[in-house]
Amino acid sequence: MICGSKTKSYLKSQNLKILGQGKLNGIVEISGAKNSALVLLASSLLTNEKIILENVPFLTDIEKMGNILKNLGVNLVRKNNQLEIDPTTISIKELPYELVKGLRASFFCIGALLTKFGEAQVPLPGGCNIGSRPIEEHINGLIALGAEIIIEKGIVKAKIRGNKNRLHGTHIKLNCPSVGATETLIMAASLAKGRTTIENAAREPEVQDLCQMLNKMGAKIYDSGKETIIIDGVNKLGGCTHKVIPDRIEAGTFLIAAAATSSSITISPVIPHHLEAVTNKLQESGSKITIKGNSISIKSKEIKGVDIETAPFPGFPTDLQAPFTTLMTIANGESKITETIFENRMNHIYLLNEMGASIKLNKNVAHIKGVKTINGMNLVGSDLRSSAALIIAGIIAKGSSNFYGLEHLDRGYENFELKLKNLGVKIIREISKNTFEENGYKIESKSENLSKLGAA
């Protein structure tokens, strides 16, 4: 039987087959941060000069953003993990719905297009189905900067108010430290006239990475990484070469996978202080963490239950709540997981319970009693991070599991199963010739293996 919401239907050509109770051993090369690369791509719209981005991961979300830029007229050339971006050929300021419907980060483009060209039209965004992620903070901030905005038939239409040709600096206080709103408003303010102050700004590393790149381009942004960011608008921005920071969420996912399997691995390159909230909790749960330069090593045996509560950076990241929940299912004792960022990010718990976990869910709080083992089964991921959590569950489970929903996983993890295989996990990506329907799902059968199970 396959479990999950019966309201959804999956008909995909690939799935992962996982043999459980595996161990991890070795070194993991961490990719560039997806959430940073996406906003850096959007920020390239602010200049008329070439941008070179290094350490850009191969992900479907990156491909979607690239297609959005190409549709605007931007010329993109990829050489391995390097992207050369030439925005001098931009010809339109409107984003088509068919390109943005599955990518929430597409909305970042509105701030850049508006401040550079004086107008922009961007459909309301899509992305992971993890609850409401409203854009009111973006809209209110742009209005404060001098934009006139209307929303018609799902399209946000923005232009600079009156006869002015530039946005104007202002003071903005965000109701919550929204990463997306902070990034959108930083881009818009970078070419505005005068000083903009953003209070209660997001402090995430990805925001800091954006500010560092914009400053390389000639922006004047101060105090990124603090609760109040100051931007002095400039007349124009130039080109630059910038290396995307390592993906702290991917790094944390592998650390949690190692802890869940009582394994020892090293991850590199990373920026250790970006992961401090995660490594502190892993240490509290019984793992030994060693930091050396830009690498982190973990050695884990028995895990004990600990409580976590998600919070904006530097707190425990919401994107690692689901993987950490999987870890706690087999921990000694009890634990409590509290999700404070998104209201619909606990879907993985139902599947974990089907595998044999003991979790009671009360709204946004999961109460977990650790069990000795969970059992493999057919699994369906409903979003990016729950997919990673369920794959970790398949690795620690007794027996085999089939994971469906790779369209979610491939949005944010570069070569995930290959990296796991290199660590010793017995996992393969299968391609299917036929399908059958069970419990409301189209399930693949008669699969052809893309790689040998357990091969490095």
From Swiss-Prot:
This is UDP-N-acetylglucosamine 1-carboxyvinyltransferase. The modification 2-(S-cysteinyl)pyruvic acid O-phosphothioketal is found at residue 128. It catalyses: phosphoenolpyruvate + UDP-N-acetyl-alpha-D-glucosamine = UDP-N-acetyl-3-O-(1-carboxyvinyl)-alpha-D-glucosamine + phosphate. Gene3D superfamilies: Enolpyruvate transferase domain. It is found in: Cytoplasm. It is an enzyme of class 2 (transferase). The active site is at 128 (proton donor). Pathway: Cell wall biogenesis; peptidoglycan biosynthesis. Belongs to the EPSP synthase family. MurA subfamily. Cell wall formation. Adds enolpyruvyl to UDP-N-acetylglucosamine. Its main location: cytoplasm. Its EC number is 2.5.1.7. One of its GO terms (cellular component) is cytoplasm. Disulfide bonds: none annotated. PANTHER family: UDP-N-ACETYLGLUCOSAMINE 1-CARBOXYVINYLTRANSFERASE. HAMAP family: MurA. InterPro entries: Enolpyruvate_Tfrase_dom, Enolpyruvate_Tfrase_sf, MurA_subfamily, RNA3'P_cycl/enolpyr_Trfase_a/b, UDP_GlcNAc_COvinyl_MurA. The gene is murA. It comes from the Bacteria.
